[in-house]
């Protein structure tokens, strides 16, 4: 079916209007009218081929919120008119241990990304959410609670689940001392989720101007990382540190902020490997771990939690012809806190 969107035609090129064909709605598929599509920093990395060879033309976008417009004859989970979300992957093998546990993002055969890859037939190029419509197997989409505005929902499908998953996995509850490194598109969701779960939340940021925002989102403390003395003052303070930063840092400074048995979870993808001083871990039985998005059951759990607690991403809604400027502003950290494209403008 004919689809209108925006695509990068080659590595590093500006995105331009682009028409392409999506598959027709199959027996187990749902079609959605895309209302909003979030801009993730990873979209920029992939358009610029900074994470390895990419497939062009590329229609980016894996933060998709819309309304169901048609369903296949075998669909049981959705009906026309439902609010629906699609995230970072659109398929997996469905048979391995991870998939059977609902951890499709760790599929042994590799998840099928929403874009910049091939669908499971190995031939069809996956095109993402910077477009006016989408078709997906019902098992890889999630229901959006009716009380949540779709513009603020779109980034939850990547930024939101990326923070919700480790917060749940490391059992954040009332009184847990959590630090969030960085207050950007990822970090601001970590603050909101951890605060809603009753944690004592500290934001660690090099941008003092963000303190008021951090506190408004639920943070109890704000520490500027520009002053080395501040690291000494909060040494051995945290049960869990969520690292959303992709810039080069001395990770050992932050590991020293963990209590005994504390864990630092790497979420932001650094440009270079960290140089970890093993003694920092051994001396207090600390751990350093990683986490990547979340599976379909956890995505649904997250959205239900957001519906119950009225949690949304802070967004700036743009028209499709502003995408290239939005990329520039995202790189310059000039957004509070996520750009979202109005799907009606494709």
Regions found by a protein language model. Give the residues of each.
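C-terminal hydrophobic helical "lid"/dimerization subdomain
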Residues: 3, 296-346
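Glycine-rich beta-strand-centered segment in the early N-terminal region that forms part
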Residues: 23-37, 50-100, 105, 145-147
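NAD(P)H dinucleotide-binding glycine-rich loop of Rossmann-like/cofactor-binding domains
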Residues: 93-181
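Adenosine-nucleotide cofactor-binding segment
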Residues: 174-183, 193-253
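N-terminal Rossmann-fold NAD(P) dinucleotide-binding loop
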Residues: 187-188
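Helix-to-beta-strand junctions that scaffold the AdoMet/dcAdoMet cofactor pocket
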Residues: 258-259
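Glycine-centered, small-residue-biased loops immediately flanking beta-strands
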Residues: 262-263
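Rossmann-fold NAD(P)-binding glycine/threonine-rich loop
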Residues: 268-285, 296-302
């Amino acid at each position: 079916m004919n689809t209108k969107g925006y695509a990068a035609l080659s590595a590093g090129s500006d995105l331009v209007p682009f028409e392409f064909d999506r598959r027709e709605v199959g027996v187990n598929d749902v079609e959605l009218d895309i209302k909003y599509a979030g801009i993730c920093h990873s979209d920029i990395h992939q358009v610029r081929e900074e994470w390895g060879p990419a497939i062009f033309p590329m229609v980016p976008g894996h933060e998709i919120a819309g309304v169901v417009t048609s369903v296949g004859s075998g669909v049981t989970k959705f009906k026309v008119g439902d609010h629906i979300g699609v995230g970072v992957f659109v398929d997996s093998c469905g048979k391995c241990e991870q998939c059977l546990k609902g951890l499709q993002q760790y599929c042994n055969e590799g998840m099928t990304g929403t874009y910049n890859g091939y669908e499971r037939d190995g031939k069809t190029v996956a095109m993402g959410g910077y477009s006016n419509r989408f078709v997906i197997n019902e098992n890889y989409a999630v229901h959006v609670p009716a009380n949540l505005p779709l513009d603020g929902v779109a980034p939850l499908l990547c930024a939101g689940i990326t923070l919700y998953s480790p917060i749940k996995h490391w059992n954040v509850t009332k009184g847990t001392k959590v630090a969030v490194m960085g207050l950007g598109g990822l970090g601001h969701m970590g603050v909101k989720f951890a605060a809603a779960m009753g944690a004592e939340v500290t934001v660690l940021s090099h941008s003092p101007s963000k303190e008021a925002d951090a506190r408004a989102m639920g943070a109890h403390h704000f520490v500027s990382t520009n002053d080395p003395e501040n690291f000494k003052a909060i040494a051995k303070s945290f049960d869990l540190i969520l690292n959303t930063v992709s810039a080069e840092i001395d990770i050992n400074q932050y590991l020293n902020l963990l209590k005994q048995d504390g864990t630092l979870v790497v979420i932001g993808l650094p440009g270079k490997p960290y140089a970890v001083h093993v003694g920092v871990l051994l001396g207090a039985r600390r751990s350093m771990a990683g986490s990547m998005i979340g599976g379909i059951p956890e995505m649904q759990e997250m959205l239900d939690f957001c519906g119950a607690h009225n949690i949304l991403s802070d967004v700036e809604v743009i028209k499709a012809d502003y995408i290239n400027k939005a990329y520039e502003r995202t790189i310059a950290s000039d957004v509070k806190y996520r750009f979202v494209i109005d799907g009606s403008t494709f």
